[in-house]
Amino acid sequence: MQALNTTSLTLSDNRLLILDQQALPQEKQWRSCDSVEELVDHILTLRVRGAPLIGLSASLLLALLAERGVPRKELEQALITLRASRPTAVNLMNNLDRMKLALAQPQWVPAMVEEAQRLVEEDRKLCDRIADHGAGLVKPGSRLLTHCNTGGLATAGIGTAIGVLLRAHQQGKVQQVWVDETRPLLQGGRLTAWELGELGIPYRLICDSMAASLMAQGQVDAVWVGADRIAANGDVANKIGTYSLAVLAHYHRIPFYVAAPHTTHDPHCPNGAAIAIEQRAAVEVTGVTGSFGSCQWAPVDAPVYNPAFDVTPAALISGWVFDSGVITPQQVSEGIFQRALG
């Protein structure tokens, strides 16, 4: 396969390396990804994360395995194993569906390689288009709030919501970005803060519970988030805490935008209630672990509820920003999400 370099994925000498997002920002560690078992472990431990990136890493690994001569039957099983690794994010399912079609071709090895490379290039272009459409919604002097991480760390390109912030910043329209730390795994505090710093975008880090106070003071002009799955009625599954921000923004009459590629839309999912929500380990809530070490702050036997995602109802969303353009609440009420986009 051709060499590849993105913020979080490197392909060189027929080896796939992933940037360990659990080690950031203290350390920049590249980890090998030579087998399906390794990739599943990276996904489950969130070394690889972000809906688009998970799908791309799976596609690239499958193509590499095909080139190495792994039998077709084993690749078919690999598709099943990878599909089960992260149930909420639909990008993974969409990418695996396309790789499955490539595997069914008579010349399946080159077909899988070409499809994986096509998916990477498509994602880069999708990010650029999302940024262009979204930046048009950002007013000069804006103070924007974002949640979790939606930049180059989560995609092959400049990102989704962070891509919008970057494009608006390049246009001189961003005064400051408020970054939610995003408990319990701190993707905002660890990853988004790091990315914005690298990009030169002015930001301030806040605890999740501080967002309401900022909105009440008139310090937030709009909220920008990504998505892991968008249902046929416009409901959005995204990182836990997104729904809270949407409720707060609605109460304070602040625009709430979702930025995502069309591959995140799932017309076969009727509404948010039908989206499977991943439940994660209690240890993520009772303490914290990273390259800096581990710390347990709650009682060891404390009962914990730890969903990785929540669902934001379509009624709370001001606009869905896709690579194809901005979709309005009126269009959603008319059923635009009930058919495939793109």
Curated annotation (Swiss-Prot):
Keywords: Amino-acid biosynthesis, Isomerase, Methionine biosynthesis. This is Methylthioribose-1-phosphate isomerase. GO terms for biological process: L-methionine salvage from methylthioadenosine. Its EC number is 5.3.1.23. It catalyses: 5-(methylsulfanyl)-alpha-D-ribose 1-phosphate = 5-(methylsulfanyl)-D-ribulose 1-phosphate. The keyword Zinc-finger does not apply. Substrate binds at R49, G50, A51, R86, Q187, N238, K239. SUPFAM superfamilies: NagB/RpiA/CoA transferase-like. Pathway: Amino-acid biosynthesis; L-methionine biosynthesis via salvage pathway; L-methionine from S-methyl-5-thio-alpha-D-ribose 1-phosphate: step 1/6. The keyword Ubl conjugation does not apply. Belongs to the eIF-2B alpha/beta/delta subunits family. MtnA subfamily. It comes from Serratia proteamaculans (strain 568). The active site is at D228. PANTHER family: METHYLTHIORIBOSE-1-PHOSPHATE ISOMERASE. NCBIfam families: eIF-2B_rel, PRK05720.1, salvage_mtnA. Catalyzes the interconversion of methylthioribose-1-phosphate (MTR-1-P) into methylthioribulose-1-phosphate (MTRu-1-P). GO terms for molecular function: S-methyl-5-thioribose-1-phosphate isomerase activity. The record marks C148 as: Transition state stabilizer.
